[in-house]
Amino acid sequence: MIIFLKKYKSKIALIVFICVLVCTVSCLLDFKTLGKQKMPGLEKKSVFMAAENTVAKNTDKAVNEPRLHAVSAALYDADDETFIYGRNMRDSMANASTTKLLTCIVALEKADINDTVTISQNAASQPAVKLGLVAGNSYNMKDLLYGMMLESFNDCAYAIAEHVGGSTEGFAKLMNEKANEIGCLGTYFITPNGLDAENDISFHHSTAGDLCVIMSYCAWKSPKSTQFLEITQTMQYTFETEEGQMVFNNHNRLLTETDYCISGKTGFTTKAGYCYVAAVEKDGRRMCLSLLGCGWPNNKNYKWDDAKSLVEYAVSDAAEDSYCDAACVTTQQ
């Protein structure tokens, strides 16, 4: 055996070398082929990575991306109907008195602004903030609309809802139908004034994205947009009642603190925090912004700071170059 191995040593070595070479080449060819195949799991991961890359590109474009306090926020181009910026903009959240945007436009579309409204005990007993409507007394619809939109009076909202819808439940149905009609499928309203409530279906809520669309409809697309803007742009409104002269002051600070704001509505409940929705215009470019959960007591001015940041972003070159689609999600956490 030893003699045999010595005799054929060189041939055995050659055979071993050839075998190793063949195996190596075969493995390399298999690996190359495997790399071209769409392997389960890897394909999904690549799609996810592509989405991450898209977000990263948007981040690169949005050099001046706003830094916000709000839990949820959105910035919307009303003409292109696309979202420019979003933070948790599809999350269902309590939205407080920003609800009154839809209350106002539904009332304007369904009733006459000169209607006489008789106040029920239910409307008169609404909690603050309230005008102090007296049950059994009558008021002009126009005066109630100004009270609701300028001072955010809860009793005015209830009186309007009962007059237009026959009941607050009937009016809520009209509100939700309008929300669905304009594409706001993440909105479900129970109360006309935005106070927190729940029923067997859900809780009173909207989304930052939906509120931008609602504001866009109110300000520019409703057949009653002109009346809506006239009401929400009025800085002070005075009228006479059986109880004496009433003076309402507009609480939308951005009307006077920026050159771009043309309408807006504030809101607050313990659950919702401070909220704000606004419409802005710049050189014919129409946009809406919304902020939900923008601080709680002791942080009342956060909404103004955030709104100004979004307004500045809206009219900056960064916003003009950073459009995203309706599924827009923020890259800022």
Predicted segments with their positions:
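N-terminal secretory targeting signals
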Residues: M1-S72, S316-Q333
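Active-site-adjacent loops and short helices of periplasmic peptidoglycan-processing enzymes
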Residues: I2, G35-G209, A219-K221
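Generic secondary-structure transition motif, activating predominantly at the C-termini of alpha-helices
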Residues: K9, M149-S152, A179, G183, ...
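Hydrophobic alpha-helical segments and their boundary regions
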Residues: I15, C19, S125, T168, ...
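Domain-terminus/edge residues, biased toward the C-terminal soluble/receptor-binding domains
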Residues: S26-L29, C184-L185, D200-Q333
